[in-house]
Every structure is written in structure tokens, then in C-alpha cells.
């Protein structure tokens, strides 16, 4: 992939950009083999790749500059701003949004936050696009509610320019730290969730719910999990760290009993909405801590699917799963190192199948799906 920002030395986020996609995939595969060394794997499935560019469905932009000439991108360690509007990871549909937002910021009087001076209001712009219908969600991350009235007053102009903006919010992040969002979310539109659809499964994206940033590869990840589960005798399943329910909603059948657990209430609201649309009455999603939920249960499901954050599921949950001993475990991980550590804490399981998904091209990161079977 050619990137003018990288060539000019202005951005180094894509550290592997000088390697071909095939070289990147080979290096990631070798890394996964290294991490799972000593753990016998019955079947290595071929890795799954995706688009080289324009694949990312989300932009997280630091806003700097002035209210008359705002700049969207990032700040170097020394505070130097870099405009990332031309990043080739973004789809072409983002460009007109960025172009319209620059004069809008002046209209609304949203002074960019100055980190050095600790002054200003607008900290970040967070933009998400649905590949299903092209609808977008825009979040203004503000230091306070001071400019809310001005923001609301200026919105009709922005919505006339960008009718694809379905969900617009103001997130309040008052802390002088590099934190992307605060707890308070103020909706500025009637619609509060963005409609998405993978493999004919309806999904919803709300402001504070995690959603994969590479929809092409994510849809194949979910479809693969559905295929694997469909080959197993599963009547009762847990989906832990379930997010908006992507895995569970793909894997569930009308006959299956499935419980999805996720600590973020916004994500659970999305999952419940999808389950209702699908008419799956035996799906139950709850906003709880996954480890606390699992260790408090007296019943053993046929299959436990886990999709934890980078830190992994941790030894307490590993120990409980080893003791509870469901027949199958599917582990989806964005950090194969912690996944390998967790699997080593499950000595009564064998690895039946492993597949790598290149969710994060041009970086060392990748997603991996692993099927474990009880010995």
C-alpha cells in the first residue's frame, strides 16, 4: 500500500507498510506458530486476509489547530499535529465528511482543545460507517457541556450537508488526559444506534459499544465461528465478552440456549435488539463481568466461546473452565500471546483447529480463532 503520510515521515502507525501483504501474512503465521509451540495443533486452517486499504470503518481524530482552521489527525509526542484526513485506511466516503466538518466547527464555535494550554472544548471526532447502508455515526468529544447549545443550533446545517449522519452525539470527557471518551453521552439525534449487517445477521453499533474496525474480515471471522459451532453437538452455549453479540448471534439456532455476557451496557442493548429482530427467544444477553458470571454458575454448557480484550481471560477464568470442563471452548483473540498463556492453563483440552484472520493489515497484530476440545 502506498501512503504519502508514511513516505513523508509524518505517520508511522502502519509499521509493516513496506512489506507486501503476503510477506505480512507469512510473518504473522510464523509468529502464531511460535507462540503455540509445544501445544499440539491438529489442524492449521489457511489464514484469512482482506482489503489492503480503505477497509477501516472508524476514524478517531484528535482535533487541533484553530476554530477557523481545525486540523483532524493526531499529535506527535512533542505536540506537533499531523493531518490524517488522507489516510488510505479510510474509505473514500470519509473525505466529504471531514471536508464539511471543518467549516461546521467554525459555525458551531467549537474551539479545538489545546493540550499545552489546557484550554478549548473540542477534543476528538469519532466517525463510524456502516457497510450495510452507508449510514454514519459521529461523536463530538468535548471537554464540557459549555458549547452544547451552539452545537445543537448549528446541527441542521451539518445534517443538510451530510444526510448519511444517522447518529450524532456529544461525549463529555473533562479530564486532561489522553482518554478517548468520557462516561456521559448526549444524543443529538433521535436515532441512537447505527444499523450494520454481517452475513445476513443484523447488528447494531451504539456510541460506547466496541465494534470491529475491519468489517470485511470481521464478517468472515463470525461466519467461520458459525461454521465451526454448526459442526458440533451444541444445545447450550455461553458467549463471554460478547460485545454487541456478533459471535452468539451468528452461532445461535432457534433450538439452542445461549447466554451472552458483556460488561458494557451499551453493547448488551445492541445485542438484545439484534436477537429480537431475529426472533431468537432462547438468547439471553446480560451486562455483567464475564468472569464473575461464569464462576457463579452451577451448570455446564456444551460450549463456551470467549472473545476477551488483549489481556486475555486470565488464570481465574481458565481455572474455572478447566474445573467446569465444557466439552468445547472457542477462543477468539486479538493477542495470540495471552491466548497461548491461557490455553496452557487448560491442560485437559487439545487444540483441534486454529485459523488466523488478518484484521489489522500493515501492523504486527492479527486476530486468531481456536477450537479446543476436552480430552
Curated annotation (Swiss-Prot):
Pfam families: tRNA_U5-meth_tr
Residues at which S-adenosyl-L-methionine binds: 212, 241, 262, 307
E.C. designation(s): 2.1.1.189
Binding site for [4Fe-4S] cluster: 3, 11, 14, 87
Reactions this protein catalyses: uridine(747) in 23S rRNA + S-adenosyl-L-methionine = 5-methyluridine(747) in 23S rRNA + S-adenosyl-L-homocysteine + H(+)
Gene Ontology biological process terms, A to Z: rRNA base methylation
Reported function: Catalyzes the formation of 5-methyl-uridine at position 747 (m5U747) in 23S rRNA.
Family label: Belongs to the class I-like SAM-binding methyltransferase superfamily. RNA M5U methyltransferase family. RlmC subfamily.
Protein name, entry field: 23S rRNA (uracil(747)-C(5))-methyltransferase RlmC
Native source organism of the sequence: Salmonella dublin (strain CT_02021853)
Gene coding for it: rlmC
Amino acid at each position: 500500500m502506498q501512503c504519502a503520510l508514511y513516505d513523508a515521515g509524518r505517520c508511522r502507525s502502519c509499521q509493516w507498510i513496506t512489506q507486501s501483504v503476503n510477506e505480512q501474512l507469512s510473518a504473522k503465521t510464523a509468529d502464531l506458530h511460535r507462540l503455540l509451540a509445544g501445544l499440539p495443533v491438529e489442524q492449521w486452517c489457511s489464514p484469512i486476509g482482506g482489503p489492503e486499504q480503505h477497509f477501516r470503518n472508524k476514524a478517531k481524530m484528535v482535533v487541533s489547530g484553530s476554530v477557523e482552521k481545525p486540523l483532524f489527525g493526531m499529535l506527535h509526542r512533542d505536540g506537533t499535529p499531523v493531518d490524517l484526513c488522507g489516510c488510505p485506511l479510510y474509505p473514500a466516503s470519509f473525505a466529504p465528511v471531514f471536508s464539511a466538518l471543518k467549516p461546521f466547527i467554525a459555525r458551531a464555535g467549537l474551539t479545538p482543545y489545546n493540550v499545552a494550554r489546557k484550554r478549548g472544548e473540542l477534543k476528538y471526532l469519532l466517525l463510524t460507517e456502516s457497510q450495510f447502508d452507508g449510514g454514519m455515526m459521529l461523536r463530538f468529544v468535548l471537554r464540557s457541556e459549555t458549547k452544547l447549545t451552539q452545537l445543537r443550533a448549528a446541527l441542521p446545517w451539518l445534517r443538510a450537508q451530510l444526510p448519511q449522519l444517522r447518529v450524532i452525539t456529544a461525549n463529555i470527557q473533562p479530564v486532561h488526559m489522553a482518554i478517548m471518551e468520557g462516561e456521559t453521552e448526549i444524543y443529538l439525534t433521535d436515532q441512537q444506534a447505527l444499523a450494520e449487517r454481517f452475513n445476513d445477521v443484523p447488528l447494531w453499533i451504539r456510541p460506547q459499544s466496541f465494534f470491529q474496525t475491519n468489517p470485511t474480515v470481521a464478517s468472515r471471522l463470525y461466519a467461520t465461528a458459525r461454521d465451526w459451532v454448526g459442526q458440533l453437538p451444541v444445545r447450550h452455549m455461553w458467549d463471554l465478552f460478547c460485545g454487541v453479540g456478533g459471535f452468539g448471534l451468528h452461532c445461535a439456532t432457534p433450538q439452542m440456549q445461549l447466554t451472552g455476557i458483556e460488561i458494557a451496557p451499551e453493547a448488551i442493548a445492541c445485542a438484545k435488539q439484534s436477537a429480537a429482530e431475529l426472533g431468537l427467544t432462547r438468547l439471553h444477553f446480560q451486562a455483567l463481568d464475564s468472569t464473575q458470571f461464569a464462576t457463579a454458575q452451577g451448570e455446564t454448557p456444551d460450549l463456551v466461546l470467549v472473545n476477551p480484550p488483549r489481556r486475555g481471560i486470565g488464570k481465574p477464568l481458565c481455572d474455572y473452565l478447566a474445573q467446569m470442563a465444557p466439552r468445547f471452548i472457542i477462543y477468539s483473540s486479538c493477542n495470540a500471546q495471552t491466548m497461548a498463556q491461557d490455553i496452557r492453563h487448560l491442560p485437559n483440552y487439545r487444540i483441534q483447529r486454529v485459523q488466523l484472520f488478518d484484521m489489522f493489515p500493515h501492523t504486527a497484530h492479527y486476530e486468531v480463532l481456536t477450537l479446543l476440545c476436552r480430552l
